[in-house]
Amino acid sequence: MSFIMKPHRHFQRTLILLATFCMVSIIISAYYLYSGYKQESEVSGRASEVDCGDLQHIPSRLMEVRRTMISDASRTDPTVLVFVESQYSSLGQDIIMMLESIRFHYHTEIAPGKGDLPALTDNVKGKYVLIIYENILKYINMDSWNRSLLDKYCIEYGVGIIGFHKTSEKNLQSFQFRGFPFSISGNLAVKDCCINPHSPLLRVTKSSKLDRGSLPGTDWTVFQINHSTYQPVIFAKVKTPENLSPPISKHAFYATIIHDLGLHDGIQRVLFGNNLNFWLHKLIFIDAISFLSGKRLTLSLDRYILVDIDDIFVGKEGTRMNTNDVKALLDTQNLLRTQITNFTFNLGFSGKFYHTGTEEEDEGDDCLLGSVDEFWWFPHMWSHMQPHLFHNESSLIEQMILNKKFALEHGIPTDMGYAVSPHHSGVYPVHVQLYEAWKKVWNIKITSTEEYPHLKPARYRRGFIHKNIMVLPRQTCGLFTHTIFYKEYPGGPRELDKSIHGGELFFTVVLNPISIFMTHLSNYGNDRLGLYTFVNLANFVQTWTNLRLQTLPPAQLAHKYFELFPDQKDPLWQNPCDDKRHRDIWSKEKTCDRLPKFLVIGPQKTGTTALCLFLIMHPSILSNSPSPKSFEEVQFFNRNNYHRGIDWYMDFFPVPSNVTTDFLFEKSANYFHSEDAPKRAASLVPKAKIITILIDPSDRAYSWYQHQRSHEDPAALKFSFYEVISAGPNAPWELRTLQKRCLVPGWYANHIERWLVYFPPFQLLIIDGQHLRTTPATVMDEVQKFLGVSPHYNYSEALTFDSHKGFWCQLLEEGKTKCLGKSKGRKYPPMDSDSRAFLSSYYRDHNVELSKLLHRLGQPLPSWLRQELQKVR
């Protein structure tokens, strides 16, 4: 019995030991599992509630975390889709302003509360490289169908999302984001921000010291995170945490921007807890665009800065530089060279005013000239006169020769090739005499202005090249001739400091790869605000950004500018009378009244010459004088004539006797299919009416071929019409050129759509060419009504049909007629059937598109188009 009991006790003891071992194992496993979970939570917790001093010691795991796919350049267009609350919402406008400033392409849509998203793809290519929501709640609360479509697009094309949280009520808020593993607390005031040095977003932005002080606004949102996919970017302390549930600490730092690494659902996002009023948010916004677009939308870190000091030797007594000021200028130049590679002040002089100050200021003049080799120099005008006030070139040349003589006498270099006009007069709007005189006296190749295309908004300033002189955009820095004393700065000294420390001046440098700053002699005397401004600006840029500041001489700077922006080489002329500042620096001898009120744009061989003849019969309608070089047509907007400038263009038009009732116009039939003409015309004459004539494109093509034969075009004489229109891609160059001139103008819908990009439909009249040929009086009544010209002219009594010519002519006194010249209305064989069939097929799709366009515009279909569409059926 005892023998049987012993094994039984052994067995019990073994079971107890096994059970105990299992329990201990479970407890240990649970402990470590819990510890692991807790550690993971602590990483996220530290990410949302940290001591800024400990940021350097955030676990390196945050840097090594796996990230989702970034946009593939070949699969998406480099365009940003921006969902705004409304067309006029403040934050939406700020977002657009930033995108425009850094010259990124964007498309805006009103964020849909309900309804469909805009098309996100074009065939298999994504239309957008990045999506921005002014209000991220519009994305969060989107209906499931559209949300799934958008998320699928983002995942498939590697597209990220930037969103801003906007608090909707004034009371404190705290809630969980639907479908996301984090919560927010809103409507808070915050202070003392710092940057996470480990954030992969940082590119322009440099993680720096703690920025103490209150941040603008009391509507901040902070993020509380409980998932490792979120990484904080900027932290701040909360100033007003009372009455929040759950409560948050006053002493801890909370994330105001978070980066969703995409581990949760495969989409990377950057979420902002406030708008762009805070300067660090703007910097991170730029970096977020760069990172989420896979650096397709990114800024170089190189910044080129040139500081011009205008008006050297100019100024009233008491506003000029003395010897100590000049020494301070030299010392500061050396100091700035430690932060801005090759930094050199660029001095613009007007020699007439040398030694016109106090005794101390005259000594300052001499000290400047004694240090002439330490600076770069450029000429102003001798007497600081505005060039547009000189109406002849010889007077300008005399002034420039005096200034050059002064320079040679005092050892000032004269070979920099750069000049600036007082008040930017004559640079834009262009005063041709200035450009010619500059080249003859100084061999000027570079200048700058703040006026092209307009002074404001500054983000639209651009460069251009005219008369082989490169014109660069110039920037203001808040210093003008009257800003001499720090305490008397307009709006108070804090306004200047605010501009330097994350304000307008700071972002001028951040957003522009090249900045030429305008300052004045008076800014370097007295309180030396010029030195104060640029020393503090360089310090701030170096502290908070990774930008590489450097200076280049003007010639190198200009070449660098047009390497970066080759599309800006061609100018885009505008009406000087539409901008008061432009009127003030434009010659009083010139008038905008000589610009046309309407344009006849073609296309060729549709009856534009006949229309022109009929138009000038009207007593209130005046045409341009004929051009001797381009078959009477001016051809300004579509050819190199455009680079001659608007003075050249306006010289073709008479001065109207009555600006209100007289209508100037020009007819250039090549405008119709020109790539450049619509944009150029809209810029110079945006209110001009546009008239085009359409005939069957097959007939137009054949007429052009016969026209070229009559002018002995070798290709037209050598090849039949069918050979021309059916030529393949490997045909001889001259044959392909003739083919293009025959066929391309007949793509009517394409060309009209291009004009409609720049002109509203009510400014466009489309004439049926067949009606013009058969019932011109009726058509001319329609034209008069469209133009709004008076008095009404009775074309029924003024036109008569000439059976010999085969078209309508002007009826003169005593029964005589005035018809078009011999080159018009030629008789030639009818088109062969093969060519007719080929062209009918070739233009089929184009004609269908034209019918859709005319239907959209509410215009009737021409009779020839109705006939062609019947063939489609």
Curated annotation (Swiss-Prot):
Segments spanning the bilayer are 14-34
Q: Which residues form the active site?
A: K605 (for sulfotransferase activity)
GO molecular function, a single term:
deacetylase activity
- Give one GO biological process term: heparin proteoglycan biosynthetic process
> Which tissues is it found in, per the record?
Strongly expressed strongly in brain. Expressed at high level at embryonic day 11 compared to other stages of development. Weakly expressed in adult heart, kidney, muscle, endothelial cells and testis but not in other tissues.
- The main location class comes to Golgi
Q: Which residues lie on this side of the membrane: Lumenal?
A: 35-873
Residues bound to 3'-phosphoadenylyl sulfate are K605, T606, G607, T608, T609, S703, K824, G825, R826, K827, Y828
Q: Which reaction does it catalyse?
A: alpha-D-glucosaminyl-[heparan sulfate](n) + 3'-phosphoadenylyl sulfate = N-sulfo-alpha-D-glucosaminyl-[heparan sulfate](n) + adenosine 3',5'-bisphosphate + 2 H(+)
Indicate whether Transport appears among the record's keywords.
no
Segment Heparan sulfate N-deacetylase 3: which positions? 36-589
Recorded metabolic or biological pathway in which this protein acts: Glycan metabolism; heparan sulfate biosynthesis; Glycan metabolism; heparin biosynthesis
InterPro entries from the UniProt entry? Heparan_SO4_deacetylase_dom, HSNSD_N, NST/OST, P-loop_NTPase, Sulfotransferase_dom
Q: Where in the cell is it found?
A: Golgi apparatus membrane
List all disulphide bridges recorded for this chain: C809-C819
> Which PANTHER family does the record associate with it?
BIFUNCTIONAL HEPARAN SULFATE N-DEACETYLASE_N-SULFOTRANSFERASE 3, HEPARAN SULFATE SULFOTRANSFERASE
Q: What does this protein do?
A: Essential bifunctional enzyme that catalyzes both the N-deacetylation and the N-sulfation of glucosamine (GlcNAc) of the glycosaminoglycan in heparan sulfate. Modifies the GlcNAc-GlcA disaccharide repeating sugar backbone to make N-sulfated heparosan, a prerequisite substrate for later modifications in heparin biosynthesis. Has high deacetylase activity but low sulfotransferase activity.
Q: What is this protein called?
A: Bifunctional heparan sulfate N-deacetylase/N-sulfotransferase 3
Q: Which organism is it from?
A: Mus musculus (Mouse)
Q: What is the lineage of its organism?
A: Eukaryota, Metazoa, Chordata, Craniata, Vertebrata
